[in-house]
């Protein structure tokens, strides 16, 4: 999303995913009244775009998995939808897309999985990820990293990923 975008770099060896690094790029709406809404949006998009591109340059991934946005119910939601779609379109290598429902079903097993269930699943599967813990459980704010980890698993069961595996053997 425009507010929080999590990126996870992982390695796949013999069918086992290992999380190597993770970041969350955060942007916040300007509180200054004299800043135009469009200028604020452009600035936030710039922060997001630069952060994503720097992360891709740092790790040089062979494959990128992304969660495509789902329907929005408001003008603000639709704006975020557009920003997300544009960001996905600019990625190189071209991203393998999954939906929020595919992500939840591929990991927790139900399309109605809660944020807490998604975090618990990701934490159990990848304790090596850079979690910030409170009482031995990741903070709720880390739902974005948990989702990014889950997106990897959903992406790995797509026909697009199967095709890539078949041509790179």
Segments and roles (model prediction):
Residues 1-169:
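Phosphate- and other anionic-substrate recognition elements at nucleic-acid/protein interfaces
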